[in-house]
Amino acid sequence: MAEATKEQRHPVDQVLPAGQMVVYGLQHVMSMYAGVVAVPLIVGSAMGLPFGELAYLLTAALLVSGLATLLQTLGIWRIGARQPLVQGTSFAAVASMLAIGKGAGGGAAGLTAIYGAVIVAGVVGFLLAPVFNRLLHLFPPVVTGVVITVIGISLLPVSFGWAGGGTGTPNFGDPANIALAAVTLLIILAIYRFLPGFLSRVAILAGLVLGTLVAWPFGKVDFSRIGQAQWFAVSTPFHFGPPQFEIAAIVSMVIVMLVIMTETTADILAIGEVIGRPADGRTVVGGLRADTLATTISGGLLNGFPVSAFAQNVGLVAITGIKSRFVVAVSGIILVALGLVPKLGAIIASIPLPVLGGAGLALFGTVAASGIRALSRVDYDGTSNIIIVAVSIAMGVLPIASPTFYEHFPSWFQTIFDSGISAAALTAVLLNLLFNGTRRDAEAPIAAEGPTPGVVPDEDVPGGRSAG
């Protein structure tokens, strides 16, 4: 009887052997580590913080990301999507945070102004989460397919920058950097193609490790940070001072929070498509609550920034086929450990950017491919769906291809449309309402088309996800 129950359990709720979960969890961390630490480094540098305080922001970001990931994957009451979603500091908030911080004079004063705005935005987002649930019918396949595709497209320039050695660096585009990225990608492809079972599923992790080893003899790996890093550090509440609450900063951050919630909704729907468990309204609300609660705690206590689901890890789930949320929970534990033990974080930080770029090409491209697969299910015959897809993708790609296109527009407009993801989502929703209205055949989200063949529906799984 116990064996039958185990066989019926949805892959999302399966607990794998401990060794496998650690390896798969580490692979998730290594694929998103650079994205997590980039935000505090950018903001901290702009605020003029010394190296020690920059390192403090970095460990705080890792700690917050880990706690948020645990909240999202395991869930508490009605909080958490209970999906294999990795949480991390959100790039969507960077521009607004820089404006808020510089407006407050930079330094610690700038950070406290940012934290005050983050706290209020998180609370507002938490209260608005059920409204997003009621708006779920606005995300039929033609909309979610567009958004998922643009998520992948918007992430690809990040991997391009990494592959070149880091955008803005003196040696950007050096053939040696590009060759290293190419070697890493070829290693991943070779492992994925020729090695069986478990080995093919850790192709990304193996590619990162082997790519780093290849880079070492050529002086591309800097291990000095490992010796300099502390063994243990804890992020104490209000390290930079009590939060400051300014109306203009709060309004700006609330707008950003709405953008982040839109992106997180798309990620929840995307991972639902990948894992074969349709994302219903309860799942979306739980995921948004986890996002916004973690953001509130991040700004209020842990010296962190807004968090959101990381789309690149959706691609990793698609590549590996490992759908267990407990694997991603292990990722959260690893992130917490990295946040408490900076020396461990310094080891991962030693991975050269070109190596990350090579792996990112496979990861981010897979996200875009998932969106294209979703769009292949849309009915284009006798409908206006083709023009909806065309214009929405164009609006999403516009700020990616021309980052300064909206520089003369008001700041609130830039906050929304400088994000290709939110621009594509808003355009697709409005055009779908214009051409398709809210008729029944356009209401179901992409993941609601029916369970993947061979997958046991959630409600039929003994011991499956709770109703919380």
Task: Describe every region a protein language model picked out.
Residues 3-6, 36-40, 44, 184-194, ...:
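Juxtamembrane interface elements at the cytosolic ends of transmembrane helices
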Residues 2-85, 92-104:
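N-terminal signal-anchor module of multipass membrane proteins
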Residues 1-24, 223-238, 273-277, 434-468:
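Intrinsically disordered, low-complexity non-transmembrane regions of multi-pass membrane transporters
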Residues 40-44, 94-106, 133, 157-164, ...:
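Generic transmembrane alpha-helix signature in multi-pass membrane proteins
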Residues 19-36, 173-185, 203, 216-218, ...:
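Hydrophobic, membrane-embedded alpha-helices of multi-pass small-molecule transporters
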Residues 56, 78-92, 137-146, 199-205, ...:
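Short, non-helical or kinked segments that cap or interrupt transmembrane helices
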Residues 18, 44-82, 252-325:
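Membrane-embedded helical hairpins/re-entrant loop segments and their flanking transmembrane helices
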Residues 102-221, 331-445:
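Membrane-embedded alpha-helical modules
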